[in-house]
Amino acid sequence: MMIIKPLQEEISFTSANTVYDARLIRVYAAANSVVTIASDVNANTSFTMHQGTVELVEKLPADTIAGTTTLACTPVSYKA
């Protein structure tokens, strides 16, 4: 079991957002969405999230995340 600790308020968006410059974020997709991570350092990447799913995403602080539908995200820390 993984314990997740929210570090900030959850925010919802579709356009590019750094999510408080966080390194680890919890992402919730209320509808099917293609999620894109944009980076100045690494190649841009993307993945698909199905409706009602949650993923943990690790990124660099300046990297942005965006979705084709609204994403609800919050910075987190975790303990395995």
Which residues fall in each region the model found?
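Beta-sandwich interaction modules
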Residues: 16-18, 50-63, 79
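Short, solvent-exposed linear motifs at loop/edge-of-secondary-structure regions
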Residues: 19-29
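Noncatalytic modules at the cell exterior or secretory-pathway interfaces
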Residues: 23-25, 57-71
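Exposed low-complexity, polar/acidic, P/S/T/G-rich flexible segments that act as propeptides
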Residues: 71-80
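Short, surface-exposed beta-strand/strand-loop-strand elements in extracellular ectodomains
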Residues: 28-46
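N-terminal compositionally biased, intrinsically disordered segments and leader/signal-like regions
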Residues: 15, 19, 37, 49, ...
